[in-house]
Every structure is written in structure tokens, then in C-alpha cells.
């Protein structure tokens, strides 16, 4: 039997909302395969939906900077260990220097930035006593760029055609709040669609419906699924009776691309207390 770590159980709990023992059993059944465990739990009704992977967040800041010509934008995530340091003036100044250099020299590789700023990073670590990591950098280039920064923890860059700055700002705010993964439903990769289709079909078939009826049920569910994860298919947060796609059409605008960063997405913190909890339960089962 595969070893099921506390970390795996914790991830499955966070992504499904199911109980610890249900998650542990599901992982045992799948030999530690989290994605397969999620699919199986959804089919059995133990998990209504799976949250996008993103374990307990690390600390740090998101920074945005747009060129003077307003045609190139950069977005950076710089991590530290505590919220206290994230608010430190020296830490913020370091982040600002990194993003300004990245934008000026068009550096889109975090590894190149790490090499370039290693001496300053080491000195700052020695000064404040916490590890600091240049986690990621990205850029967006377009004739029309919009941006939004929410409390230095969520940042968005968005490019579009036919949109003024007010329209772009509203779009960026929506993206920050609603977390779309793709621009249009047609952009959702076939493997993502196929996987969800199979899960929904298995759920529908369990109700005892004939396959043709089940397929019709799934068709509606899939339209909802792709709509919810694509920008243009989501209900617009500022006018919930309209989709973003409808709102864009009214304004004669088309979104080309967007980038959304949130501090600590997918970064795992220490799970000591949770591990102790799992270990205690494991001992009871022996």
C-alpha cells in the first residue's frame, strides 16, 4: 500500500471539502493519486466540486508596473515568510527594484532575475532574518493594457482591443475577484473538457438514466462548467445579470489575454499540527 502523507490528505481536504478519513480512504484507493481521488469522490458524491489546486498561501507581495507608453506591463510575485516582512519598507523597495529592472530589460525569466539580484537578496535576508524568493515574473504587451492591484496580494494585467482605460480597469477588477482560467470557453484545453465530461457522465449514469438522456444532461452541465472557468462566460461582477462576454459586446471590446497572480498560490506551508492529527488517527487504526 502506498504511503499516504499528511500533506496529500490536507490537499485533498482543501480541494474537496470532504472529511479527513474520507480523504485518506480515497487516497489509499488510488495509491496516492490526488486527481483520481478527486474524480472518484465527485462520482460518489463525497465531493461536490474540486477547488483549483492552491494549498496554504505563503506571504509576500504582488507588484505591477506598466511602461510609459502604456503598451508593456509586468507583474511580479516576491515571497517572504511572514506578513510582517511583506509590509517592511526594505522588502517593498527590493520588489520595486526587481520589477522596474525586469520591465526595462524585458526579463520574463524568474531564474534570470534570481541570478541578477542574488547579492541584494542575500544581503536583505541577512538583514531581516527571513528567506526571500523571487517566485515569478510575467509580461503582457498590447496596444491597450489594463491593470488592477488588490492590497498587494492580487494583481491583474489584461489586454484588449476596443477598450478604454475605464473598461480595462473594470475587467481587471472582475478577473481579480472571479479567478477565470481562460479568456473564452473555446480556450479550455480538450483534456480538461474530456475529463470533466467523463466525471459528469458517470454521475448522470449513476442516476439510472439511459445513456442518451445522460448525455443530454451532461451537455448542459458542460456548458455551465466551461462558462464558469472562462472570462467571457462568467457573470460580470459589476452587472451580474450579464456575462462578461455580453458586457464586452455592448462596449465593442474584445479581450486578448490576461494574467492574474495571487500571493502564495500553490505554495505549501508547514503542516506540523495537521500531521500530528493524522498520525494520531493512523495509530488508532493499527
UniProtKB/Swiss-Prot annotation:
PROSITE patterns: EF_TS_1, EF_TS_2. It is found in: Cytoplasm. This is Elongation factor Ts. Keywords: Cytoplasm, Elongation factor, Protein biosynthesis. It comes from Hamiltonella defensa subsp. Acyrthosiphon pisum (strain 5AT). InterPro entries: EF-Ts_dimer_sf, Transl_elong_EFTs/EF1B, Transl_elong_EFTs/EF1B_dimer, Transl_elong_Ts_CS, UBA-like_sf. Its main location: cytoplasm. GO terms for molecular function: translation elongation factor activity. Gene3D superfamilies: 1.10.286.20, DNA helicase RuvA subunit, C-terminal domain, Elongation factor Ts, dimerisation domain. Pfam families: EF_TS. Belongs to the EF-Ts family. Residues 82-85 are annotated as: Involved in Mg(2+) ion dislocation from EF-Tu.
